[in-house]
């Protein structure tokens, strides 16, 4: 017997939203910016990587970011993750520190989080593009309208999801998560500016697995392999 989650996909829950004029306007804006010679991250093919790598029916955990990394070769469509061979930025270093303190897993030499995404961890930024060297430069082109819709669609997910909301921006999204089957864990942002105020020591990785276990869902293997393709 198939469950409702198995019959739902990102296409079925977001298909109508993608037909809205504002969504096409976002894509047109990004296309024009590239055509004008501006460098936009991530590359076009990677913009929707979070949704491609973590199918709707497979989502177990959601980690929300604000916007993509704005340095060369970093962003590839997964919040907090960087491409293989690129050093982990400071926030990700703190995520790894907490992961090590929480679960004892070794800190990897890379910051490529695709393994998490493929296990059901949706690594979603509120804005899906950014201009090189200009953080939050695309924060006002209505990406948030689309990504809020993503969160709302997950609120309707028939199985329990654990939302990890780090920092005040992500925590504002908790108002979109009203279904009591889901669980929300909050902590300060892992940025060096705030990590010591409670992100370090939050133990969200073990807590998320405990909640998934209680909900009858498979736990996440948070340890990252040393070799990545």
From Swiss-Prot:
Gene Ontology terms describing biological process: base-excision repair, AP site formation via deaminated base removal
GO CC annotations on file: cytoplasm
Organism classification: Bacteria, Pseudomonadati, Pseudomonadota, Gammaproteobacteria, Legionellales
Gene responsible for this protein: ung
Intracellular or extracellular location(s): Cytoplasm
MF terms (GO), sorted A to Z: uracil DNA N-glycosylase activity
Protein name as annotated: Uracil-DNA glycosylase
Domain of life: Bacteria
Record keywords, A-Z: Cytoplasm, DNA damage, DNA repair, Hydrolase
Record: active site: 67 (proton acceptor)
Main location group: cytoplasm
HAMAP family, per database record: UDG
Catalytic activity as recorded in UniProt: Hydrolyzes single-stranded DNA or mismatched double-stranded DNA and polynucleotides, releasing free uracil
Cited SMART domains: UDG (SM00986), UreE_C (SM00987)
